Amino acid sequence: EWIFTAPPFWVIIIVIAAIAWLAKGWKLAIGSAIGLLLVVSIGQWNNTMQTLALTIVAVIIAILIAVPLGIWAARSQTVSTVVRPILDFLQTMPAFVYLIPAIFLFGVGVVPGMVATVLFAVAPGVRLTELGIRGVDREVVEAGNAFGATPGRILRQIQLPLAMPSIMAGVNQVIMLSLSMSVIASMVGAPGLGKDIIQALSRTAIALGFEAGLAV
């Protein structure tokens, strides 16, 4: 969190704009800079950086769980059979329900919010990774086998590159769900914009709620 909150706001804006420029071009960079300057102007910079930090860490953890598990499920029907009902269960539970076991196990604070966010976001990453690996043309895989490629090499050089669009769609879903859940996680003590949103709801503070919602 201190990585985002300690430096001056203009340093963070420049870094994020540069990353956006390298990733997608100048339009995204300008849009990111304008959006962050708007956050500064409404006085929500620290809360936004806290929410961003929570979201980034949750996304990284969720991806580190989802992608390997999705690959394993794609390569083993037994694992897929075991994992599928668990993912169904995770995706059918309301977002607020994730907070209950997190509070029971970890108390109130950042950790239960992080755990709840990861659990809420991980399922689509697993599903779309498995779908992408299973969707690779079987003939391409058989051609790799015919040339003597090992299973690991087939995975790295054939299946993962061809499945990347589906995997990235899963990563996109993980990011969106993590962002939405990181706001709800403020109900159990996680810092960030969610605290202002909850206060706005409890006090009917329309202006505060609008500012926090705009920052999100």
Model-identified regions with their sequence ranges:
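Hydrophobic, membrane-inserted alpha-helices
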Residues: W10-A18, S32-L37, V97-P101, P161
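Transmembrane alpha-helices
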Residues: V115-L119, P151-A185, G213-V216
